[in-house]
Amino acid sequence: GDVYKRQLLHLDIVGDGMLKEKLQQYAIEHDINNMITWHGQLPRVEAVKVFNSAHLHVITSVSEGNPTTIWEAMSYGVPTMSFDHCGMHDTICDRCGIRIPIAKHYEECVSAVAIEINKLLEHPERFQQLAEGTIECAYHYKWSERERFLNSLYESLLSKKKVY
């Protein structure tokens, strides 16, 4: 899957991993390295600056259950695109992000990501819609809201308890 409007894209990659060198080589061979900033590991203050300038947070991992970066992105109003599995399924909804079904083959997964990115580039107004939805959804993950929810749940359970 190719991304068609490449001139509209810039990719910021924060962090390092086992595939970094392979990905950098791929970017050079496919003449897209000029569209990528390879940040590596960043101090938190610098990583926050990258988040604040982003239009989309993309997680391509299929091994992480529910990374905290989703909530960090939400706190900055940045929607997340992720594979639809584990905790991502419960955290990301159509209002605050894009869930991509996991396919049987790697190539199908890559193609699905490219298709979703192309849809966004064809309809850039969707970035704003997702950002607004992300701000709404983020409210439910604030500690104060979680505390309120858990307290009401406990009170509900305790009120139903029989005392002998």
What function would you assign to each model-found segment?
Residues 126-140, 152:
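A short, well-ordered alpha-helix in the C-terminal region of glycosyltransferases
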Residues 22-42:
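Nucleotide-activated donor-binding/catalytic signature segment of Leloir-type glycosyltransferases, i.e.
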Residues 41-42, 49-54:
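Short alpha-helical donor nucleotide-sugar binding micro-motif in glycosyltransferases
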Residues 79-82:
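Short hydrophobic beta-strand element within catalytic cores of glycosyltransferases
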Residues 1-4:
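Short, small-residue-biased leader/transition segments that mark boundaries at the very start
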Residues 48, 67-75, 89-90:
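Short alpha-helical segment that forms part of, or immediately flanks, the ligand-binding pocket
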